[in-house]
């Protein structure tokens, strides 16, 4: 393992994690599946269960910008209300969707190409996998449901395709105790439906929008424009710090610019110097991502972005501050790029005006 880490830190070995593999599989399988698969999953969630489902994430973006061409690699919801049978019904109905579209999904899975040998690092453990020889992928017929007690605001329920990956000459598993060779498949979760179970009554802004991907008269309940913008800004921050490909960051920026164009004119009238609220100051135990989210939630995306740039230019609040989701990564090699990534994020949000 030490030899792999030396190669990683020298830049000889690319930093590819299990999460990167799962993200690539979403791009190559779910995003390339026929639209009927995502539509069936959407209806399995919304139409067959009680409570209130609010569409969020990338699907909400397509609704607000009336985009009928973007491919969706997952659908995200906020769920308000509680039904004891909801989780079982939801998994059963989504399993039926996968069963119905299995042949197509299986073909897309087998078409995914990965070069060999391939080294994949574990995110939260000091370990890695090295796949030797031709790499083959197989789609498991059964989906997986993962429930997480997330925070005081919501719990998270995610549904995933299970992809088994094997290599012709076996897999070397690197751990603290040495190297173990195995022929057993590696299993990866490809999340295609995410549901946040909200713990508070619904009191947020929402709107009805046409989901043009599904048809001209297909109306859905989505998060408000400002909330969708704030969520996408946080996603942009994560894209930059997790070293997503430039084309993905550019695509995110393109969508953000279209969302900003829909904001009412009065959103731009406030001056950052007119606001001396305490939210401009990061609390001692507050993570940098929570601080950014707080600024955006309190001030809205237009004024919030200007406040963030003002704080960045006049204080050292962001200096050396690594987002919380990266502090838990073991062997993350790009900590030295932290300040450079903050500069890139601020340049990106400046370009939105």
Swiss-Prot record:
Compartments where located: Host nucleus; Host cytoplasm
Induction remark: Early protein.
One cellular component (GO) term of this entry: host cell nucleus
Pfam families xrefs: AcMNPV_Orf18
Record flagged with keyword Secreted: no
Cross-referenced InterPro entries: AcMNPV_AC18
Protein name: Protein AC18
Species this chain originates from: Autographa californica nuclear polyhedrosis virus
């Amino acid at each position: 393992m030490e030899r792999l880490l030396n190669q990683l830190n020298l830049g000889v070995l690319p930093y590819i994690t299990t999460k990167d593999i799962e993200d690539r599989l979403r791009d190559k399988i779910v995003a390339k599946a026929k639209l009927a698969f995502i539509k069936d999953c959407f209806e399995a969630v919304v139409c067959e269960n009680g409570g209130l489902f609010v569409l969020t994430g990338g699907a909400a973006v397509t609704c607000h910008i009336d985009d009928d061409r973007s491919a969706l690699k997952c659908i995200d919801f906020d769920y308000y209300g509680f039904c004891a049978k909801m989780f079982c019904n939801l998994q059963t109905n989504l399993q039926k969707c996968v069963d119905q579209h299995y042949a197509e999904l299986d073909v897309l899975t087998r078409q995914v190409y990965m070069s060999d040998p391939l080294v994949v690092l574990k995110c939260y453990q000091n370990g890695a996998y090295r796949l030797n020889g031709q790499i083959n992928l197989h789609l498991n017929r059964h989906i997986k449901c993962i429930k997480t007690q997330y925070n005081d605001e919501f719990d998270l329920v995610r549904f995933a395709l299970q992809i088994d990956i094997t290599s012709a000459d076996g897999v070397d598993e690197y751990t603290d105790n040495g190297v173990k060779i195995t022929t057993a498949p590696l299993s990866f979760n490809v999340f295609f439906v995410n549901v946040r179970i909200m713990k508070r009554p619904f009191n947020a802004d929402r709107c009805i929008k046409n989901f043009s991907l599904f048809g001209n008269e297909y109306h859905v309940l989505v998060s408000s424009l400002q909330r969708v913008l704030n969520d996408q800004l946080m996603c942009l921050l994560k894209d930059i710090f997790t070293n997503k490909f430039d084309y993905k960051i550019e695509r995110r920026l393109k969508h953000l610019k279209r969302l900003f164009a829909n904001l009412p004119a009065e959103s731009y009238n406030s001056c950052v110097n007119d606001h001396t609220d305490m939210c401009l100051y990061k609390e001692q135990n507050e993570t940098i991502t929570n601080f950014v989210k707080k600024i955006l939630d309190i001030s809205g995306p237009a004024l919030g972005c200007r406040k963030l740039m003002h704080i960045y230019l006049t204080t050292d609040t962001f200096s050396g501050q690594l987002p919380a989701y990266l502090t838990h990564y073991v062997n993350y090699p790009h900590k030295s790029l932290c300040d450079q990534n903050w500069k890139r994020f601020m340049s990106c949000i400046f370009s939105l005006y």
